């Protein structure tokens, strides 16, 4: 007589396990997120035999001295997109597990289909689709004008069958589209559930490590823009990237949130065209599409995205409020940071905006999280309040403290050099970031306090 399947209760938000149902998850403190899942009494023998030895070789693992382990780096291979390679840390590492997420229509499947069609001419690849039919994928490839002669396709949702076929085909790169529709026979729950997503991702990661196959898994996102699935999915994978972009914009940004083989928060920029995604080699140019007319409330700053500087424009609109509680709206910037800077501007700059509506926006849909944008945001708000434009050739960056001091930011010299490459001739930066030898033709103003920055602005 077969044993009854085991039951478990798992949180949909963080993946914590519980022996019985409860209203609130004690790990992430979310309410009504714990659901029941059914597990098989024991895993199949074939599954354990096929994928024993997680860290790279089948069989029983052996204890080794750290000094005896080879330091030879695994050879990476290019995806065919320099921007994609940059986000991955220099290319794809064999045996790595990569998770790519994004909103519907962002271009995840298009980017991966273009990548595999390019690589199929050099190496063996496999594209596994569980959401679209093979005919639909073929029509999309034909519409984009991609070479399809050497690309291997598979329509399957069973992870066990996919790994068996992949073991026969032995591809160097395999795409799973998507992880939410895959399932395992051992897990008696519907595809897309917490248990299925967690176990299928762990199963694929184990297969990638033991067989040396690089696997890219496509994942959906939730309402708040985070990758769908439990938090325990993150330790299973080596690299997590997110493809983002506004529905009314043709530009897409690819950002890494976790990378064991490269820098985190690395940014790649693509443009959606009729021939698919095309990489943008100079992202600063698209984020600085300023008109010839000089307007108030606009400033340019240099943010540091991963391993490269990026010039972005910050716009501010300060207007008299007709309501008792003035509005404070921030797009692309943190709302709490805006409130702090308004208080600092009032206390240490002598400018009161308690009766003003304040709207700030980062042009191009870029999300700026680093504090180096503080000084540029403050000067943009002052420019809008006074209706006095900042010079077109001025770049600003620096962190503003609660005492009104201007703090230095990392990579100040590189930021100034990047601004000089794009034709900027003046810069307001923290005094500690002033280079000993500024770029030729660049005038750098070092400021220590907010009052110093406002004084420089008055003299420009």
Regions found by a protein language model. Name each.
Residues 132-133:
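Conserved Rossmann-like nucleotide-cofactor binding loop
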Residues 2-13, 17-86, 93-99, 106-117, ...:
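Peripheral, non-AAA+ core regions of ATP-driven protein-machinery
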């Amino acid at each position: 007589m077969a044993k009854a399947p085991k039951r478990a209760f798992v949180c949909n938000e963080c993946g914590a396990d519980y022996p019985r149902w409860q209203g609130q998850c004690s790990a992430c403190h979310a309410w009504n997120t714990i659901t029941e899942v059914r597990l098989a009494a024991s895993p199949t023998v074939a599954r354990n035999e096929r994928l024993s030895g997680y860290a790279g070789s089948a069989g029983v693992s052996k204890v080794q001295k750290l000094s005896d382990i080879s330091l030879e780096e695994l050879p990476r291979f290019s995806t065919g997109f320099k921007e994609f390679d940059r986000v991955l840390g220099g290319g794809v590492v064999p045996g790595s597990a990569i998770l790519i997420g994004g909103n519907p229509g962002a271009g995840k499947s298009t980017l991966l289909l273009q990548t595999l069609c390019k690589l199929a001419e050099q190496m063996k690849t496999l594209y596994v689709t569980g959401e679209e039919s093979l005919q639909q994928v073929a029509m999309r490839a034909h519409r984009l004008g991609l070479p399809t002669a050497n690309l291997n396709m598979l329509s399957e949702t069973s992870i066990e069958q996919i790994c068996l076929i992949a073991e026969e085909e032995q591809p160097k790169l395999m795409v799973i589209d998507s992880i939410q529709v895959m399932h395992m026979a051992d897990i008696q729950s519907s595809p897309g559930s917490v248990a299925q997503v967690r176990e299928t991702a762990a199963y694929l990661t184990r297969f990638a490590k033991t067989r040396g196959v690089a696997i890219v898994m496509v994942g959906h996102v939730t309402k708040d823009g985070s990758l769908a699935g439990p938090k325990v999915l993150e330790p299973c994978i080596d690299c997590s990237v997110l493809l983002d972009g506004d529905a009314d914009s043709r530009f897409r940004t690819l950002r890494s949130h976790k990378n064991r083989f490269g820098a985190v928060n690395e940014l790649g920029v693509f443009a959606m065209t009729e021939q698919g995604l095309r990489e943008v080699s100079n992202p600063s140019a698209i984020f600085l599409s300023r008109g010839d007319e000089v307007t108030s409330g606009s400033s340019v700053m240099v943010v540091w995205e991963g391993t490269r500087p990026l010039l972005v424009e910050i716009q501010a609109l300060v207007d008299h409020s007709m309501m008792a509680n003035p509005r404070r709206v921030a797009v692309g910037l943190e709302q709490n940071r805006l409130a702090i800077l308004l208080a600092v501007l009032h206390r240490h700059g002598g400018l009161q905006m308690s009766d003003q509506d304040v709207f700030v926006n980062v042009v191009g849909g870029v999300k700026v999280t680093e504090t180096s944008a503080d000084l540029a945001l403050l000067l943009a708000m002052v420019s809008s309040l006074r209706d006095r434009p900042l010079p077109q050739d001025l770049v600003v960056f620096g962190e503003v403290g609660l005492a009104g001091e201007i703090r230095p930011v990392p990579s100040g010299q590189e930021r100034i050099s990047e601004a000089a490459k794009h034709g900027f001739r003046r810069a307001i930066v923290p005094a500690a970031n002033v280079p000993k030898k500024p770029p030729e033709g660049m005038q750098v103003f070092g400021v220590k306090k907010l009052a110093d920055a406002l004084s420089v602005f008055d003299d420009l």
